[in-house]
Amino acid sequence: MEFIQHDAPLSGRIKDINLNDFIPNQTKAKIIKFVDDNLVVLIKNQFINDYKLKEFSNFFGELDPPGPNPYGINFLPEHPEINVISNVKNSNGIPIGNLGDGEATWHADMTYLKQPPKYGILYAVEVPKNQGNTHFANMYKAYEKLPNNLKKIIDDKIIIHDSSHNSAGMLRKGFKKVSRPDLTPGARHPAVITNPQNNKKRLFLGRRPNAYVLGLKINESEKLLNDIWYYATTEEITWTQNWEVGDLLIWKNLYVLHKRDAFDPNSRRIMHRTQIKGNDNLN
């Protein structure tokens, strides 16, 4: 097994591993540390079933069930811990997964919860070639790039994270459309979080739509968020995953943002995703 750090603002790759094989605890610990150090890690050429996907995911902690989707159903009744990300519909015209084929804008997963998931794991079952790429941005580097005046403003701010819409902009089942950002439903989180293990600060933004900075007028909140998001998504702090079947990607959900490109609606894309329960300290 080989650990390769990419020449990029974040990400690495693990080679010569088969997740169908028995993996000893010492190797598990090395994998977890490599993910923690590089924030996003790719493992290619994995051909595993859903049981193995859950088994591998458990390396990182307790599985966290996916959030509500617009259809209000479990896509895989035998595996409720797995979310299906897909544009495919079954013979009855019912989607077999979430998020469709459009762009999924920059976000971190489920930050509208008090305890959003710590890790995300995404496995490519079926993908169109050179489409639907996923981009990741390093929130340590985003904070580093902020001008000092913005750091002073944002350091003690709290942001409301919208729970009504998903990252594709679809209204979740049981929610109403947000009329004003300051009325947004969802958790309230610090805009800046310090990792106690390395004492480094990072931005924690969730999603841009319907976000609101507590204590500010709406126009002030909008301007501040727009300024911060400019630095959070600049190309020089990002890395892009061009998917192939059998790719498995692990990322630290609370340390990065990610987005997905749109792809041809006539193509087929099926991804299986798990996530790991977080905690109150958001680390």
Stretch-by-stretch model annotation:
Residues E2-I250, L254-N283:
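Fe(II)/2-oxoglutarate oxygenase catalytic core
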